[in-house]
Amino acid sequence: MSAHTGASYEGIAGKYAATVDSKPWNAYYERPAMLALFPSLVNAKVLDVGCGSGWYAEYLLSHGATVTAIDLNGEFVALTQARVGQRATVLQADLTNPLDFAAGGEYDAVICPLVMHYLRDWQPAFREFQRVLKPNGVLVFSTHHPFADWQDYNTENYFAVDLVEDEWDVGKVRFYRRPLTVISRDLDATGFCIERLLEPQPTEDFRLVHPEGYERLTKSPGFLVVRARKK
């Protein structure tokens, strides 16, 4: 079985990037929760993992951070580079391999928005995040909520790690679902302590643009957002 499903974005990255800045699940649900868990960004050195089309990289820069942004998909790397120019270092990198561009203890924070569910095994990536973080550094990441995936994809065993496929407006995407206990276990095993865990609520702006989605997310979780600190 493949270690990651990031190749799912090949051929659809441009279509995805065209809508992701304003898509309510991102703009009015996932991002507000991520931002609420960010540490102070002024003069912070931050690694943006899975930079996509560059929204987070641009936000981090505008709030005083020095940014390295990485993505597996070459088209996303080009889109982020075009968006931020020379203000950030933008690289193509695979989370199933060591992050050889980064020195140990280089970053104050690692952010990883809606990326981890494309990996079958989280521990190698978490170990690299732990390595590149400074002592007491912070990891903030978002992922699919375990209950939502178990409910939506009719998998028989909640406690299993399963490969599932979804049909988006821009095409088919594959990812892995897993139970909450595996998420907690993998963080602890790689030297992280969970500080905060959010099951986000959609903002009022979400309700205005997508009432049906808003109604669902106020009653059933979609994403999980975690802030963990290097032990």
PLM segments and residue spans:
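Class I SAM-dependent methyltransferase SAM/SAH-binding core
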Residues: 47-49, 53-98
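A short acidic, Gly/Pro-enriched loop at the edge of an enzyme's catalytic core
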Residues: 100-110
